Amino acid sequence: MKKRIDYLSNKQNKYSIRRFTVGTTSVIVGATILFGIGNHQAQASEQSNDTTQSSKNNASADSEKNNMIETPQLNTTANDTSDISANTNSANVDSTTKPMSTQTSNTTTTEPASTNETPQPTAIKNQATAAKMQDQTVPQEANSQVDNKTTNDANSIATNSELKNSQTLDLPQSSPQTISNAQGTSKPSVRTRAVRSLAVAEPVVNAADAKGTNVNDKVTASNFKLEKTTFDPNQSGNTFMAANFTVTDKVKSGDYFTAKLPDSLTGNGDVDYSNSNNTMPIADIKSTNGDVVAKATYDILTKTYTFVFTDYVNNKENINGQFSLPLFTDRAKAPKSGTYDANINIADEMFNNKITYNYSSPIAGIDKPNGANISSQIIGVDTASGQNTYKQTVFVNPKQRVLGNTWVYIKGYQDKIEESSGKVSATDTKLRIFEVNDTSKLSDSYYADPNDSNLKEVTDQFKNRIYYEHPNVASIKFGDITKTYVVLVEGHYDNTGKNLKTQVIQENVDPVTNRDYSIFGWNNENVVRYGGGSADGDSAVNPKDPTPGPPVDPEPSPDPEPEPTPDPEPSPDPEPEPSPDPDPDSDSDSDSGSDSDSGSDSDSESDSDSDSDSDSDSDSDSESDSDSESDSDSDSDSDSDSDSDSESDSDSDSDSDSDSDSDSESDSDSESDSESDSDSDSDSDSDSDSDSDSDSDSDSDSDSDSDSDSDSESDSDSDSDSDSDSDSDSDSDSDSDSDSDSDSDSDSDSDSDSDSDSDSDSDSDSDSDSDSDSDSDSDSDSDSDSDSDSDSDSDSDSDSDSDSRVTPPNNEQKAPSNPKGEVNHSNKVSKQHKTDALPETGDKSENTNATLFGAMMALLGSLLLFRKRKQDHKEKA
């Protein structure tokens, strides 16, 4: 083990340090001037930064413009009076004929099952706008398919002749999007489906407030039957239950009996009584003379009918009666097609039944890879409270296809606004949009629970993509999609007495070619009738065939410019992210904070070939603005990984020739935030308030847990086992507990300006955990010369990969030293321009004197260095 034979006094050592520092500084200053890093380069760098910033600002401005373009506005161009279908811009139209695929199903009423109504043609029109769409024709092949329950001859008609069917596709005017390159345009396919009819009766006195006695034990039911046990609720299917009842004993006015439905059935159908105390009035039970024998109500929550006798039964015996009531599916309790228990309790007597629901599939659309597909159902209409609300469920892209430029239109009418009581507007309509995780788990009944884990609400993502620019229409821009969505509509209708008619339309293109325009629509209608009962008018009707597909301009028109996509808002430059530690052998954690005007991101790695095992993990989160000029001529092999995300404001001139492995952490709110892991043989000159002149030779394996507040008052609580030779001229308050194999155990608290020469042979096997928190708000001048001639042979090569913001004095900027030639790639323009070397832009004539002066300074520094080395050699000798 090498020992320090001689050691200079503090004064001499201090002088030699300063002399060596001057020599090193002279070399650096001379080299700097010699190589001509002058003011002009700094100016050029600043100009380049300005240019870059200007470009960035311009890009931001362009982004703002694009954002403005992205938001559709009404009446922004002269073409806004044209219908959406006119915006197909059918350039390069295929001359081949395309099949017309029209599927039509049944419309229903809310009258009893025997009443049918024929719907109007299901052409998608908007009669609210004054402008008319240009009549256009396209040769297509007719392939019409009509499905209904009363006609089984679903014929497929195909002709070789070119049928020019001019269909008016009056979608909302001034659509906020444009379908470009319509190729192979599919004919709009509209499927008409009315939801189950509404079970509505004339307003009667509620029997819910029955105050008499439950006389279920005095009532006997008989001849129970269900009209049918299999039907399609999505095609207005329902059934009726009929039963006779006999009162076997005397009853009086106010007495009542009950009937209860199972979970799979409801008595109210799609009528919503949640705003009417969840109570539905039922038609009175009357005698042949028209006298009211009993009044009835239906409790929505308990699914219980209550029949309350009137004073007609007073003093009467052998009372007989019968009732027939419509029954509907419970969409929530029977969400899938299948057979369910339908056990009905009448006057405490159970009638066991089975009911089978064959829901027509909600997955419908154009049968081609990028065909539009959408369906909907009205699942609740408030007809009793006067609030005039309805609820609708819409399945968007239930086939889960890859679609481009997808738009969905939710309309409060079908063909003509004046023929529907629906109201769709920003004030009358509330939309909630959900993304479906697993399409196979969607219900067949259109019931969608917002709390279902299979649904993820994404309404906030569509806040700026829902438009109410057209009368009675909500337009939703889905864009390019691959998933299925559920839209829950809470709407209103007026009290004009018209049927509630709604329509949903989806249109899209092939996302790959931006062609192959496709459109598909779906109609719903609820017919409300007040009468002597309630029924689910689910009768099958033959709707008229919709007229053919969208008008297409036979003349090729130029391809429209693609719809601008919104540029992301310019985001502020992110904070510099600290580079990951490459796993140093050290573990110190410093959470320090300093106030800085600049940001330096130093990512340094050093490799230490030493016997000192420093296990530190330093995490310095400081901010400083370093206005410093530092020249580190170090030969250190440090196995350290310091990640400093710091901004230091230090006005220091440090010249370190260090051969060290130090694990230190300083948080300087003042002038420097240095986070190093090194074993230092350092000669540093820092402009600080404390002047520490120490020469220590430590052959130690120490881990220091120090908490120093360097206003150059350091309080070090260390546990070290050291073979050290230290000479400190410092203002230090050291509370040290050193355990050395050299028979010295010192627990001292000293404030010393001491000259200690310890030549000890100690085997230090210490393990200390350094958790230091140093807060230096100081101006310190540290002149230290530490020579570690220890068992840690640090013949090191320090590799510093740093990215720092440095503003040299006098506008001089130095290229960072990079011994190993590694490059740090930064994403910030400001950092790149400050670290990349720039070409010389100044006048060469101005650098002539600077070159001469630099050479002289370098020579002077070399002489001083040589003198120092010689003196050191003599001292060692």
From Swiss-Prot:
Keywords: Cell wall, Peptidoglycan-anchor, Secreted, Signal, Virulence. Residues 842-877 form a propeptide. Residues 44-61, 68-95, 120-189, 805-816 have a biased composition (Polar residues). Residues 44-192, 530-849 are annotated as: Disordered. One of its GO terms (cellular component) is extracellular region. Residues 96-119 have a biased composition (Low complexity). The modification Pentaglycyl murein peptidoglycan amidated threonine is found at T841. Proteolytically cleaved by aureolysin (aur). This cleavage leads to the inactivation of ClfB. One of its GO terms (biological process) is cell adhesion. It is found in: Secreted, Cell wall. SUPFAM superfamilies: Bacterial adhesins. Residues 45-542 are annotated as: Ligand binding A region. This is Clumping factor B. It comes from Staphylococcus aureus (strain N315).
